[in-house]
Amino acid sequence: MNSIIELTDYYSSNNYAPLKLVISKGKGVKVWDTDGKQYIDCISGFSVANQGHCHPTIVKAMTEQASKLSIISRVLYSDNLGKWEEKICHLAKKDKVLPLNSGTEAVEAAIKIARKWGSEVKGITDGQVEIIAMNNNFHGRTLGSLSLSNHDAYKAGFHPLLQGTTTVDFGDIEQLTQAISPNTAAIILEPIQGEGGVNIPPKGYIQAVRQLCDKHQILLIADEIQVGLGRTGKWFAMEWEQVVPDIYILGKALGGGLYPVSAVLANNDVMRVLTPGTHGSTFGGNPLAIAISTAALDVLKDEQLVERSERLGSFLLKALLQLKHPSIKEIRGRGLFIGIELNTDAAPFVDQLIQRGILCKDTHRTIIRLSPPLVIDKEEIHQIVAAFQDVFKN
């Protein structure tokens, strides 16, 4: 294991500080390290493996398509893209979809759409379009996505970033109201902030944001890359708020844990600003990606993993709420997306949980984030709870 870590560290760029653990196999909820030790994976690649690791249905779809046709350019039609587009548009109740690869790439595309819509439809002078984002967000690390962040540490050394972006506190409707100007084209938010610490908005906040958008002719963009596709116990986390955004951004679990697939979805009145040449993607919507994503969506539906997430997530949250320890500040979550916020450094607790076979990670230093595959069962949840009880007792 040490030689693998040393080799990787020697050749890798230094933009990650990984746990000193080498994973070599995954199946369902579990992963194994190179020493053969088994873990319950409560990271899931940060909600990539919602369907579980190496789901046989998705693997089968991947291998069958890979042996037939993997890539063609979007200057041609493929035989499976249209059916996938119909499936995902019906799921999101949107007219159009733009298939892409990574989550941050989809955010970049949504920014472009919002800007073009702002100038062409709302009539904002080109170059003066503004987008409002939320403090403590995470939309990605490419320049456009990074421009939406308020984390100076993430942005240091990468200026100048996009102009016309501003951030306000997540959950503060008065601050958001004050930030809106005639040049505001879009408000982008995560319905539940993920990397920010599983932050759930105050009751009625998202509905109030929707009302502001309607009043001021502003697009509401929901970044559901991490929280969508069953993670919170709904197909889309916006469903918890009974709010329909103008634009959905999806990713992560859209590729079933096997392939990078992302998408931007909107209705005709928004998506029509994209015309030939205004956007493109070499790999977006390729036949292999589409075969995998189709199977990934089918597994979520056929195995009722969205409903399972709500049911078992509620069970897990209720059990964790019984934990008593002076270090625990708050435990919160929806579905199988749970944050345990401490009033101290979470890293030692994470280390102890990993030693007990629970693979997890801290975020923002004090929060333990749990997002196991949605195929988890009650016995595995009991093991997670037992590990937490043991760690906090000792």
UniProtKB/Swiss-Prot annotation:
Could you list this entry's UniProt keywords, alphabetically sorted: Amino-acid biosynthesis, Aminotransferase, Cytoplasm, Proline biosynthesis, Pyridoxal phosphate, Transferase
What coarse category fits the chief subcellular location reported for this protein? cytoplasm
Matches recorded under InterPro entries: AcOrn/SuccOrn_fam, Aminotrans_3, Aminotrans_3_PPA_site, Class-III_PLP-dep_AT, Orn_aminotrans, Ornith_aminotrans_bact, PyrdxlP-dep_Trfase, PyrdxlP-dep_Trfase_major
Query: What's a BP term from Gene Ontology annotated to this protein?
Result: L-proline biosynthetic process
User: Under which EC number(s) is this enzyme classified?
Assistant: 2.6.1.13
Q: What class of enzyme is it?
A: transferase
In this chain, where does the modification N6-(pyridoxal phosphate)lysine occur? 252
Task: Name the Pfam families for this protein.
Answer: Aminotran_3
- Where does this protein act, in terms of pathway? Amino-acid biosynthesis; L-proline biosynthesis; L-glutamate 5-semialdehyde from L-ornithine: step 1/1
Q: Is Isomerase found in the keyword set?
A: no
**Localisation per UniProt entry:** Cytoplasm
Its recorded reaction(s) are: a 2-oxocarboxylate + L-ornithine = L-glutamate 5-semialdehyde + an L-alpha-amino acid
Family to which this protein belongs: Belongs to the class-III pyridoxal-phosphate-dependent aminotransferase family. OAT subfamily.
Q: What does this protein do?
A: Catalyzes the interconversion of ornithine to glutamate semialdehyde.
Q: Please give the name of this protein.
A: Ornithine aminotransferase 1
Organism of origin: Staphylococcus aureus (strain COL)
What taxonomic ancestry is recorded?
A: Bacteria, Bacillati, Bacillota, Bacilli, Bacillales
Which gene codes for it? rocD1
